[in-house]
Curated annotation (Swiss-Prot):
Pfam family, one: Bac_DNA_binding
Subunit structure: Heterodimer of an alpha and a beta chain.
Keywords recorded for this protein, A-Z: DNA recombination, DNA-binding, Transcription, Transcription regulation, Translation regulation
NCBIfam families: himA, PRK00285.1
Biological-process GO terms, alphabetical: DNA recombination; positive regulation of metabolic process; regulation of DNA-templated transcription; regulation of translation
CDD domains, A to Z: IHF_A
Stored PANTHER family: DNA-BINDING PROTEIN HU, INTEGRATION HOST FACTOR SUBUNIT ALPHA
Protein task: This protein is one of the two subunits of integration host factor, a specific DNA-binding protein that functions in genetic recombination as well as in transcriptional and translational control.
Cited SMART domains: BHL
SUPFAM superfamilies reported in the protein's UniProt record: IHF-like DNA-binding proteins
Family (UniProt): Belongs to the bacterial histone-like protein family.
Name of this protein: Integration host factor subunit alpha
Molecular function via GO: DNA binding; structural constituent of chromatin
Length: 110
C-alpha cells in the first residue's frame, strides 16, 4: 500500500505529538514549497533523499495503439526524481524476508 499525505499527517501526529491540523498544514506546506520551486524552474535537492529535476522533452513521433496511425507527441517539460545515495543504499540493504513482507503488505495478503 502506498504512503499517502494522510499517512504522513498521522505519523507526525502520533510520533511528534503535533495536533492533526498543524501536521496537515506542515505536510501541505512542504509539498507546496517543492511545487513552487519546480514551477519557477528550480530543481529541488533533498540531502539524503534525492533530487527533483525538470527536463524538457522534444516533440517525437508516436503511434495510436488502436489504429496504428502515426501521431506527433508534443514537446513538454517533465519532472524527474533521482534517488540519492543514502536512499538507494537503504533500499538495497533490505533483506529478502523484509522484501517479502513488503510485497505482502502491498498486495493486502498480510
Amino acid at each position: 500500500m502506498a504512503l499517502t499525505k494522510a499517512d504522513m499527517v498521522e505519523r507526525l501526529f502520533s510520533e511528534l505529538g503535533l495536533n492533526k491540523r498543524d501536521a496537515k498544514e506542515l505536510v501541505d506546506q512542504f509539498f507546496e514549497v517543492i511545487k513552487a520551486s519546480l514551477e519557477s524552474g528550480r530543481s529541488v535537492k533533498l540531502s539524503g533523499f534525492g533530487n527533483f529535476d525538470l527536463r524538457d522533452k522534444r516533440q517525437r513521433p508516436g503511434r495510436n495503439p488502436k489504429t496504428g496511425e502515426e501521431i506527433p507527441i508534443t514537446a513538454r517539460r517533465v519532472v524527474t526524481f533521482k534517488a540519492g545515495q543514502k536512499l538507494k543504499a537503504t533500499v538495497e540493504a533490505l533483506q529478502e524476508p523484509e522484501l517479502g513482507k513488503l510485497d505482502a503488505e502491498r498486495t493486502g495478503e498480510v
